[in-house]
Amino acid sequence: MNNSFKIIAKATSVFSFAFIFMACQNTEVNTEKMEDIELEEQDVEAPQSDVDLSVTYQVPTPNELFTLFSDVEVAFDANLLNSTSNTEKYSSNKIKALNFGVYSTDLAFAANFGEATASLKYFSVIKNLGDELNVNNAFDQLVFDRIEQNIQANNSDSLFNLSNETYYNAYTYLKDNDRGSTLSLIVVGGWVESLYILTNLVDYEVDKELLSRIADQRLTLENLYGFMAEYQSDSDVSEIMASLLPIEEVLMNLESEESSIETGVNDNGTYNLDGGADFFMSQDEFNSLKEAVNALRNSIVESEI
């Protein structure tokens, strides 16, 4: 491996983002199955809700990676977001679903930084796309009113939670109505946009924590493939799976070392799970990943895929 140092990422198993997604929704964690889960070191809030734990979401959410920004010095950059005027280019359901995911990530990014005006603008865009995709239940007037109220109160935490709630509602509706193909496209669009924002924000020499999370996306990609496999008979899904191959080539060739798993509960009531595989990313690999992500993301937002 070349270049001056290695970026290490504690790897998650295929259930890592399932666990994170449930944590974002304040659901409980099934401790009986905890020994089967390999998670990177992070604090996850202890269970407080009575939500059914039998539901497993094996896909990433747009919000999860952006929570790291509170711990590192990263500035909001509106130029990284997909222009809302691009919606005029989106005519097919495939491209609408992909960009629904893109805009959901942009909403999460803006909300994380407390960008109230941008949050409202991107919520309006995904509401309109949701209507066109028949995902109406995720965007009732009550949610819209709550977003406006939080913008007026400059409440960035609630904006972030509402952006997550919107995505969750759309996810649940599509899953419950056997629209996994559309959901697959939304998830891929959101994940690609998250990687695009991250790889264009970080400095390889400085932002080691964010870089480790980027390297960790190898496991997330495996998780995505597993989720989409059920729907690959749909030509739109099989095509987007093929378009991920350049990203897969970089991530799957990262070096790794195995480490033991340790679990526990901290004094503040949060779960701490550490271990799994350690991934290493060189600067050349980071540059190759960034190039592959940029190419796919631009083809999505420009409706060229």
Q: Language-model features: where?
A:
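Bacterial N-terminal signal peptides that target proteins for export
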Residues: 2-13
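A cross-kingdom marker for long, charged
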Residues: 227, 232-305
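C-terminal motif of bacterial Sec signal peptides marking the signal peptidase cleavage site
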Residues: 20-23
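N-terminal Sec/ER secretory leader and immediately downstream segment
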Residues: 33-147
